[in-house]
């Protein structure tokens, strides 16, 4: 892979030419596309639940806030804008500031203002790319006040806050959040740490993954899971970094030690060598592994816990007997006893259906793996793009008039693309009409921005850019107006120079001025 390393100290030398004409052409073209997409989404929408920004305000919200993206894959591009259009619906003003909702209708298991922490990691990953940082600043403050509710479901909150900080650095945000984050971490240790087993445990449902195959192996659906243990590692590591930033040396050493311990126990205790996968150990049993691979076994890769020697686990993602399906990935390997897709019992089952929540985790994990370790075994750019396209194409529904419309809901039939929970709830005349419509339980835009195009802000204020497109896949693309570490980043690729009328190759702009160029889009740029 060709690599470019460019420091900010060289910017004066490199930015003598302002390619404003190219950027203006892109802005005008994409602005028109945004208008068209919003018009389509609005016309196809039954606006049942309205929060801060209704559909009439959707176009202005997107124009004011989101990074612009265009590419040759128009279905992927449409899904990108659709997910921003739906995220906007979940921005909710309250007397105490903004929160980001999961469901649009109020549901009885939510906390104050209908907030639920379960998808928090996805909501922060996605929302950090909005220009207006107030939404997530307020939302973070909400969880710091509602500390008990922040532990109602598994939620790597310190990690999520730090990811937001990387895009919108503000030391006062860290300083204000840090005491509450320490309390939340301590609460997990007091309630979910099993000293005898040397692991954290969780109910599958409070991981947000109810009716799981591994959960059924314990009489109370509890287990020592790679999810909660990986989240606790990620939070300890984030708290150590925050402590260092704040000059809290003693805290830094404590949390570093906790993180190192957790990384070791995930690798030593939750890795099934015979299956070459991270698995659940059901609680109240003989400490043996669940016999099945479940998709959440990829979660440790989100946080850099495994080393390269375990990358063969990624072959399962593209194996039709593993997790691959037309509208997958499936939540359980398809070869396993216990895998099923049914329309009876609980409407939210994690024993086979495809869940956007899990798909987003897995794609984040795969992107991080390739960015960190390079391609290896099944961890390839081809696997990432193939799975991202499958995920994108799953964001569809055929309506009553036979028209295909963009849609995001709770869980999918991995073989037909039907939204299972929706079908079941409609049949039972459920009181919350269209409960899962526009469901804000996963990320997608972040997978394009930080994954596919590879914009990765760092704690120290640097920005690494490494696209994950297989060489020769696209002839052109542009991702512009990305707010990142106090700067505005744009990445423009044109193989021939004919599409945008610019120099062939990939150009990176910082604050509208050229900062780097490569002849290919296999590039790593440190700004």
Question: Which stretches of residues belong to each language-model region?
Answer:
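Non-catalytic carbohydrate-binding regions of carbohydrate-active enzymes
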Residues: 157, 246-280, 312-487
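C-terminal beta-sandwich/jelly-roll accessory domains of carbohydrate-active enzymes
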Residues: 475-527
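The feature captures the catalytic groove of carbohydrate-active enzymes
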Residues: 26-50, 57-60, 147-155, 189-257, ...
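C-terminal motif of bacterial Sec signal peptides marking the signal peptidase cleavage site
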Residues: 15-16
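Acidic/polar, glycine-enriched structural segments that form the non-catalytic walls/loops
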Residues: 21-111, 171-173, 182-187, 243-245, ...
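Well-ordered alpha-helical scaffold segments within catalytic/enzyme domains
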Residues: 62-74, 113, 121-131, 157-173, ...
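Positively charged n-region of N-terminal signal peptides that target proteins for export
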Residues: 1-4
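Extended glycan-interaction surfaces of carbohydrate-active proteins
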Residues: 74-113, 128-144, 190-224, 264-354, ...
């Amino acid at each position: 892979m060709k690599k470019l390393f460019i420091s900010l100290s060289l910017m004066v030398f490199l930015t003598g030419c302002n390619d404003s004409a190219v950027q203006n052409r892109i802005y005008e073209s994409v602005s028109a596309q945004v208008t068209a997409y919003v018009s389509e989404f609005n016309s196809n929408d039954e606006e049942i639940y309205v929060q801060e920004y209704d559909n009439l305000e959707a176009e202005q919200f997107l124009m004011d806030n989101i990074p612009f993206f265009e590419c040759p894959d128009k279905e992927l591009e449409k899904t990108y804008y659709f997910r921003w259009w739906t995220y906007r619906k979940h921005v909710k003003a309250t007397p105490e500031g903004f929160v980001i909702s999961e469901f649009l209708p109020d549901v009885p298991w939510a906390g104050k203002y209908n907030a639920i922490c379960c998808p928090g990691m996805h909501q922060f990953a996605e929302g950090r790319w909005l220009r207006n940082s107030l939404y997530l600043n307020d939302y973070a403050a909400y969880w710091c006040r509602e500390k008990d509710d922040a532990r109602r479901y598994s939620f790597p909150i310190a990690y999520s806050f730090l990811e937001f900080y990387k895009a919108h650095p503000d030391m006062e945000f860290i300083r204000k959040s840090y005491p509450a984050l320490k309390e939340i971490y301590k609460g997990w240790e007091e309630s979910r740490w099993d000293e005898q087993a040397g692991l954290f445990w969780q109910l599958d449902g409070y991981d947000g993954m109810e009716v799981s195959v591994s959960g059924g192996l314990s009489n109370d659906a509890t287990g020592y899971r790679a999810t909660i243990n990986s989240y606790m590692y990620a939070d300890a590591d984030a708290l150590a970094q925050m402590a260092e930033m704040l000059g809290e040396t003693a805290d830094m050493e404590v949390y570093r030690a906790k993180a190192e311990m957790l990384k070791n126990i995930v690798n030593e205790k939750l890795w099934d060598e015979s299956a070459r996968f991270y698995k659940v150990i059901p609680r109240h049993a003989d400490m043996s592994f669940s016999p099945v691979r479940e998709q959440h076994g990829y979660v440790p890769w989100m946080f850099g816990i495994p080393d390269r020697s375990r990358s063969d686990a990624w072959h399962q993602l593209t194996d039709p007997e593993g997790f691959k399906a037309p509208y997958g990935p499936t939540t359980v390997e398809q070869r396993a006893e216990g895998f099923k897709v049914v329309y009876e019992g609980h409407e939210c089952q994690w024993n086979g259906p495809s869940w956007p929540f899990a798909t987003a985790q897995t794609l984040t994990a795969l992107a991080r793996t390739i960015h960190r370790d390079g391609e290896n075994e099944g961890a390839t750019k081809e696997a990432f793009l193939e799975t991202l396209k499958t995920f994108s194409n799953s964001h569809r529904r055929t309506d009553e008039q036979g028209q295909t419309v963009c849609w995001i809901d709770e869980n999918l039939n991995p073989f037909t693309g039907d939204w299972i929970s929706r079908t079941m709830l409609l049949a039972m005349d459920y009181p919350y009409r269209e409960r899962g419509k526009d469901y804000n339980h996963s990320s997608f835009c972040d997978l394009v921005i930080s994954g596919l195009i590879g914009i990765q802000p760092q704690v120290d204020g640097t920005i690494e850019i490494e696209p994950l497109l297989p060489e020769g896949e696209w002839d052109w693309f542009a991702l512009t107006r990305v707010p990142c570490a106090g700067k505005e980043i744009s990445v423009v690729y044109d193989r021939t120079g004919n599409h945008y009328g610019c120099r062939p190759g990939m150009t990176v702009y910082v604050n509208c001025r050229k900062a780097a160029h490569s002849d290919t889009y296999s590039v790593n740029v440190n700004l």
